[in-house]
Amino acid sequence: MAQQQQQQQHHHHLQHQQQQQQQQQLQHHSNLLLLQQQQQQQQQQQQQQQQLLQQEQQLQQYDNNLYSQNYNMEEYERRRRREREKYERQQGIQSDDRETSLFSEPRRLTEGDAEITAALGEFGDARNYINQYTVGISRHAPGGGSGNGSIGNNPRLQAPMIQQQVSSSISSSASVASSLLPPGLGQTQQQQQQQQQQQQPRPPTYLKQADNKPPYNGRGGYPGQPMKNDIPSSSGMAPPRGPPKLNSNSSSITNNAAASSSSSLLGPPISTQVPNGREKSFLGPPTTGTALHNGGGRFAQPVSNKRPGVGIQPPPPQEKDVRSMLSEMKNHFQVTPLNPIAATPQAPTRENYNLNAPNKFKYAFDIVDPIMPLLNSPPSVTPSSLITPIAPMTSPIAPLLTTPPQASQLPLGSGSGNGAAISATSLSTTTAAAAAAAAVAGVAATVAATVAPIQQLPPTPPKAMSVTPPTAKPLKIEKNPILEKQDSCLENDLELSESEDERKKDGRSPGSSSNGSESDSTESGSESSSKGEHNHHHHHQQQQQQTQQQQLHGHHPQSHHHQQFLQQQLQRQQQQQQQQQQLTANGGKKKYSQTIIASGANTITGLLTSSGGLGSSSGNNSSGGGGGSGNGGTTSSSSGGSMGGSGGSSSSGGASGGGGGGGGSGSSSGIGSGSSSNKTPSPTDSNKWNLSRFFHKPTSQTSSESVSPGNVSMKVPGILPGGAQIIPESIDVTTAIVKNEKIHHDDHLMDIDECDEDDDDVDEQHQQLRYGAGLSVTPVAVKKEEDLGLLTAAAIPKSQIKRESETQISHQRLSESATSGSSSSSCSSSDSAASASEVVPMPGPGETLQIPGVPAAITSVMRVPPINNMQKSQSMSVTVTPIAPLPASPKPRQKKPRKKKMMSVLTPPLLDSSDEDEPSTKHSSLVVAQAQAAVVPPPSTNSTTTSATTTKKGRGRPRKQQQQQSAGSGNLSSASAGSSSQAKGPTLTAAKKTLVKASASSSTSNTNSSSVLPRKREHSSQSSSNGNTPTKKMSSIPMMPAAAASAAATLLQPPAVAAANAVAASSSSSDEESSSSSCSTSKSSSSSSSSDDTETQKTNCRIVKLNKTVPVTAAMAPLAKRSSYHRRSGSSSPTSSSSETDKPNSNSHNNLGIAAISNSNSNSNNNVIVNNNLQQQAMPQQSPYKVPLSGGSQQLSSSDSSSSSSGSSSSSGDEDDAKREKNRERKPKSDKNKISTLTRIFNNKEGGAKKQGQVVIIDQSEEQLQQQQQQQQQVQIRDPLPPPSLLSQSGGVKQRMTPTQQQQLGAGLASPARTTTPLLTSLICKIDLSKLSRERILRLKKLAPSSSNQQNGHLTPNGHVVQGGSSPAGLSKVKHEHHQLHHHSQQAHSHPVKPEPELDSLYETKFRPTNVKQEFQLKQERDRDRNRERDQQQQPPPRRRKRSSSSSSSPYKEKKRKKEKTDPMLTNAKDQMLQINPMLLPSNNHERLSYDKYQLLQEDAAAAAAAAAAVAVVNSSNGQKLFQSSIGGGTGATAVGPLSIMAPSTCSEAVQTTPPTSVTGAGAPASLVSQPPPPPRLIYRSYFDREEEHPSDDLRKSKQFLQEAVQRKHAADSERDSFNQVTLYLEAVAYFLLTADAMERCSSETATWTMYKDTLSLIKFISSKFRPYQQSANCQQETHNKVAILSLRCQSLISLKLFKLRRVNCRAIINSLTDFFRNGRGDIVNGNTPSSISPSNSVGSQGSGSNTPPGKIVPQDIHNQLCKQNEYLTYVNSAHELWDQADRLVRTGNHLDFFRELDHENGPLTLHSTMHEVFRYVQAGLKTLRDAVSHPTHQSQ
């Protein structure tokens, strides 16, 4: 047992041991396995670590190499890189953004470049988005990746967003590496990697190492340096909504993490930055497959979202990302275009890439929609303080694009949202403009950086502005250079100031707030950068943001709440900025209040783009004028709307942005404005399209653009498609309108409030102004009918809104610079409110400009249709001129007008927008001139001098000055000079300067515009207060004189041009004044201008009709008084350019106290305007010196005919009228009726024009208007021409429909009750149009028919003066008759308006040309009629009566009648014109029409001169006819002399073809008719009109030719002189050709063929024989070369003839051969014998002598056919080869002139020429050559 137990124990022990051993073994084995696994893992880890280290080392080495390379580069290259880097930093451009992009761009291009941005801006955003969301390249690390902002970012660029998904500390590259590593090692390795990367010295680059302190005090300058990303709240944006940044926000941490991660795997390549700080598109050697997964590290890793690592938190589903990407792409691209355009002052939404106006629409996707989607897009990441760093990107678009890299630094929950928020923040931080752009750019940025909900933008702008306004840099993508220029950093850059085009485009800012944001801020930056730079930027941002918000609001209801929030923020910012502006400029407060008021409207989409509302609100804030933002806003941004009033002024209206308010703004910023003014010209230039593209593009405006008011909310200011301005009737709008009216007064008073208000109104009006006549029509277009017609641009055309302003608009758009600038310039100059209006960008075709205070209907003027506008412009030139100023309201004129004039002086910046060259100087001059104008008496020659002065200061000059300018320079010259000057940069000058007559027409438009605008504004002011209303009238009238001056120029020009000018004036005046009142005045003024008696005469006609109906004497006395007073003032201040302009205006337009009104006194000016209107009737005699000038100008306008007729009657009548005008001046309360009328018109309850949607502006005081309004309401309701009756009813004051319209609009602006005048629009429009056109025509006709006295007796300076003070009815009758006669003579003379009998004077405006051609033709007809009238002076009046009655009977019927008459007459007129002045026809239609107008005006003036012995007619090359009434006497004569001298210069501008000539008395007609010999006209004939030759078939004839040929050949054989020999040979060849040609008809084909073939051989022999002579260096070389060319032509034609003779055979051969080759007939042979193709038949079996290659057997007939075919086709080939050879010889030998002469004399020789033509051509050429050889001096080449 014991043993057993022992054994068992032992056994157990053994078992135990065995078990232990087994366990040990198992343990050991397991340990070994573990060890092996561990070792393997360790090895793997080591390998991976080594790989990572190697990659990092490689990347580091690569970076170091790059760095060393960079520093080893040549000094020049380094310096260039540094400069570029600095430039990019300054502009907020991320070089890495550009270079790391998927599509690398040439280094030489910088996205910041304006042109490149315009061309690629959209592309840049799209590229950024693609890089970030699709390819994974993230220039903006945080923004690039939706989840992992940091993975794909260039560490240097910005610390990539720490991968929030994985760990805050792990960089995106680390996450990528971890994803490659085993799951267990991923995080550790990532951490290690991150640590290593952080520890590793960052590759030396220009980027400042992240130290939580962005370079340049947080402004961030290095492309890769994060912009204060570590400061979460620095941006002032709401905290980011996305997951919190894992890495500390500190830029150093973010940068380090991003840098380390990117450097390890992807970072270095992605962010590889050249030492210059710019990232290289090449990221360096691929570190690993992982690094390359992204494309060799070239593209930023999509961030873990797109490629989640094993250890990294999975990103959101890719599908979702893809969908979001697609939606973002779609939204962004739509929105993104806005961002670049946001840089432009226009509505950023649509015109992001407005950097160059032409590109405005190229790259804009419906930005409004995209913005809304962005807003709608979830604000996954609200921009946090990080966003603020982005703020440095100033340019709205560029910042967004650039922001993404910075945004990538931001710890945004969602990259996309983050990027957008960042960009928005950075934008807002950068500037208000940037913020505004950021709102748009926010969308773009969202695309680039990620979808950043725009919702973030609203929060971002406030903080961003406060946090980084200075830091904000424009991004490359954006128009940063422009914004940069605002900062004055970019001023040196080529973006804005470098190129006038860009500056003009930027200058569009006056035209559109969106555009203006960058460009305006740039302007303000360069001009008043220090003063309002930040404010300006903020304002721009606010404006842009508001615009974007509005757009979003209008287009994306979903984000409406968000938009509201943004708007609130923007409003707060604007308020703050406005406060700053207030500090900066006097108008700041007003602007601010106006902004608040306009903000509501601005929110509306219409204002957004139209620059009325949004522009107005932001503009008011930013540009010291509501107009500043949208219209002035744009302008104001350009003017540095932030600058305050100055900013507003500074941009072409940026003022104008101040507009009137810009005026206020301009005036408050008057000084700053001066600076801005310099850039303003470019804005004006840009205005031409700025307005169109700003207003075309804006989505919000698009809705406003709807033809029907239904589309455009009447509560939302906007521009209807027709160009009518919608002035909301809402309380806010009313307030704005009231403010505007006040602004008119204040402008006269130079009140900041009024300036601001004016800016609001003016902004919108200014937009219209920008469109040339759009503004003018705005008031007119108020009528709802027009809203529908606006789209067609024909609805208004009717008597209602027949506004030539539309025509003008098209004119202006065509000649954007010339007409538009002129209009805006005029508006701005004439009225400070108008000047603000100038800033208001006119909507593009189909767009509506919304004026906050004006009812939508009022604004629904057809601005958009440029073509229609052009047509209307000519016929309705006057139409645009509102009648508002006409009613004599001495009280307002004296007081308010003066202030307004002062505002006008301040307004010069607005003018500046039109005149780029002399904006600030003009501005100063304007102010001084205004001051002086009051003192300076109007010298008779002033008008002449003024034209030059005006030209100099046209731009900066306020409307007053502009009026004065036009009037001052002999009206035409002043109008063309002043208007051109004003439009110097942009509108008027461009199109109209081509032909000075066009320029004069433009000038007239401008002048009218100015005149109208002052009226408008003055009328507005007047409507506000009784005294004011007359003042407004005066202002308008002074404008009218300016317009008249321009009209005078136009008179010489065809009425169409005058009409166009009037339209320009009308549109500008309309824009400047309340839209409604402006329109009326514009029309009146325009009418005057087109009449060519100068606006004064036209105004007189209208005023006389309206004012005379109302006590003409009462109105005239004050007017005359004012006129004389202003005359004195104007004269006294001739030294100052403004003063000079003023007094010339005064002189030119006696009736135009305008000159004086504009320049001399605001109050006095307004009064003078009214007085001038009356004076035109009564004053001409009173102020003969002024009258002569005025007369001359007026003659250009419609005053010509009425000038002569009223010449004698005006002497006595003028003095009385002048006295009456003076009396009226003394009766400031005489405008009570006017005020009441306006009030009623604007009161909805009263059923006035407002209810009707028509704005009737009466020239009377507001009291009078109110009294008359009741009457007018009925009349107006019936038709748009009631104002005449109202005027007659108004008692002492003459009410013009046009003035009524202005007054109504102004009244609406002045009094909230009147604010709602939507219905007034149509009424006003109708009245203005008919009145203007008829008035002008009447005057022209009157000049011819009535020698001394006419009912319409034109007051030489003042316009038509009824002889004894004829009743308005009589005057209107005369006008009607004249107009009708004019129409008949012109065949409906482009006045399709249907006048209504009640509104005779007003009804004239109804006539408007259907098109420019029609007007041109009508004018020609009128010329013929005038000639008849000269023979039979008494006949025309009856005709006129007949026509007037017919026209007044029914507008539609009359239109139809006119059309019927016009169609045949147009043809006749055309033929006549061609016959009479074929050479005078300008190159283009517009010029041609202008010339026609000029001609017609000349004829009218001549007729008038012939008719009126008392009137002295001075015809200058300008085509200006200066009529001096006998009253003028010596003074008149003196004035005439200087005027005639000045007129020629102006005239030359207007009509280049007419040499300056001055004639007086009877000589005038001859000089008028006499014109320089027309240049040779090119005659083109149809190919089928060739002469059909019927050569004799007589064989004897061919024999005769043959004998001649043989004789010459034999003579040539014996000739020794080489030249004679060659010519004889060639003659022989010509006769041989004639012989062969005759043989074709009588001989066999073979004989003919032989003859041609032999002839070809002969000529070839001759050519070869004389070829050496062609190469000789002697004097005969050229002659031999010419002979050789003739020879080659002959050879070519003979070759072609040989082919034609065999064409039938050739066709048969071709068919046979085609059949042969198609069927494959013929045997294939290897050798000589036909056989199979077997190898046996190859060389071996063939004979040794047979080396024929294998081929196909061709039958003999086929071979013969091939030979024949070759022969025939060779002829064809030779024919063309020889012909081309001859052509080359012609060019290389410089013989073009010689052969051109031959072609002109003998018809061109072509391959279709017959042999007879060849013979004639060759004989003529040889004869010329012989003559040249015989008479070398006459040798022609």
Curated annotation (Swiss-Prot):
Comp. bias regions, Low complexity? 16-25, 162-179, 187-200, 247-264, 509-529, 542-552, 564-583, 815-837, 927-951, 961-1013, 1034-1049, 1056-1091, 1130-1139, 1157-1173, 1189-1212, 1267-1276, 1727-1747
Q: Does the keyword Disulfide bond apply?
A: no
Q: Which residues bind DNA?
A: 952-964
- UniProt biased composition (Gly residues): 612-633, 641-673
Q: Which residues carry this modification: Phosphothreonine?
A: 468
CC annotations in GO: nucleus; super elongation complex
GO BP annotations of the record are:
periodic partitioning by pair rule gene; regulation of cytoskeleton organization; regulation of DNA-templated transcription; regulation of lipid transport
List the subcellular locations.
Nucleus
Ranges of compositional bias, category Polar residues: 678-690, 698-711, 868-880, 1021-1033, 1174-1184, 1345-1355, 1550-1560
Phosphoserine, modified sites: 497, 499, 913-914, 974, 976, 1517
**Basic residues bias: start-end ranges:** 553-563, 892-902, 1373-1386
From start to end residue, where is composition biased (Basic and acidic residues)?
Answer: 84-109, 475-488, 1217-1234, 1393-1407, 1416-1432
Q: Which GO terms describe its molecular function?
A: DNA binding; transcription coregulator activity
Keyword Phosphoprotein assigned to the entry: answer is: yes
Superkingdom, taxonomy of origin = Eukaryota
Question: Spans of biased composition, class Acidic residues?
Answer: 490-500
Which key words tag this protein in UniProt? Developmental protein, DNA-binding, Nucleus, Pair-rule protein, Phosphoprotein, Transcription, Transcription regulation
Report the sequence similarity comment from the record: Belongs to the AF4 family.
* Stated role: Has a role in transcriptional regulation. Acts in parallel with the Ras/MAPK and the PI3K/PKB pathways in the control of cell identity and cellular growth. Essential for regulation of the cytoskeleton and cell growth but not for cell proliferation or growth rate. Required specifically for the microtubule-based basal transport of lipid droplets. Plays a partially redundant function downstream of Raf in cell fate specification in the developing eye. Pair-rule protein that regulates embryonic cellularization, gastrulation and segmentation.
Q: What is this protein called?
A: AF4/FMR2 family member lilli
